[in-house]
Amino acid sequence: MSRQSRQGRMNALHWRNEVQKAQLGDNIANHMAYIFMEILYDKFGLSFRQLKNFYDRVIERRKKWQNDDDQELTSTTMLEYCQKRDIKVVDWVKKIPMSHKLYMADLGKNRAVLGADRNIESALVATMLLTIPVLKQSYKFKNSDIHEFLKWCEYFIDSYWRKQPGRKEHYLNDEMIRQLFIEEEHWDLLKGCAV
């Protein structure tokens, strides 16, 4: 095998690993979006209009954060924002069992990619860092509300991971939350409209 061919394969492998890492973050963000919608609607009483507005604002922040040219919204500034307000997002993420985090990233048993633990944790931290300022600034959440929100997120992550006794189904998943909104409230979260 020539050196150029070997280098090409190494580059392809590196590219595939980077794509897998990015996909882990997207998987976590997608699951967390469903969890956020359920918690904010059921536990904090946000309306559908507020939920759609919340989602749009978080996505807007994510795009701004991913823009390398924009130095105003970085991981560091978001972390400092939470630290100044005594919201310990990193500690909260570390408290969640790794098996739960792997499940949220759609990685089954023995399917973890190299370095997945750090990538999953950083994706979960980033998701929360993008979300918390929106809740505090747009919806006037107090620190106690944020801590309750984090508590409910932890509970729902556990419900995603935990299987029902004697069954293969988990207690909760994205489709269950979507169906709940369709059946009870006549709203499709995926389409963002009434049904």
Task: Write out the residue ranges for each language-model feature.
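Intrinsic disorder/low-complexity detector
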Residues: 1-40, 64-137, 166-195
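Amphipathic alpha-helical segments that form the core helices of the histone-fold
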Residues: 54-63, 149-160
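Short loop/beta submotifs within extracellular cysteine-rich repeat domains
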Residues: 143-144, 157
